[in-house]
């Protein structure tokens, strides 16, 4: 369901970016098209103006592509990335038609080592939340 993006195309059905508390993000590798960046910045500007407290939000880049915005605190407790991954999984359950999401982890405004640590904990939390006990219940 999740994949880390080394490139983004208009063919993928959904992608997620990470923003800081002020709704800013980095497109370090210029993965986003100019049009997508413009739409994202416009949406982020709206969230900033509304002083949105939402941790996760989404909007349509086009009729076939959705962008998920994940707000991340600069300073956080050690469990925070794991918790954020679980919250993201729960949020995605509202979008049954989406089968695959590209995660643009480099949009985090962190140093490389911190990005690696955050992403591994985020995925761990996502995986934990997605786990079901169906096989244990069957007799």
Regions found by a protein language model. Give the residues of each.
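Short amphipathic alpha-helical segment within the helicase RecA-like ATPase core
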Residues: 1-139
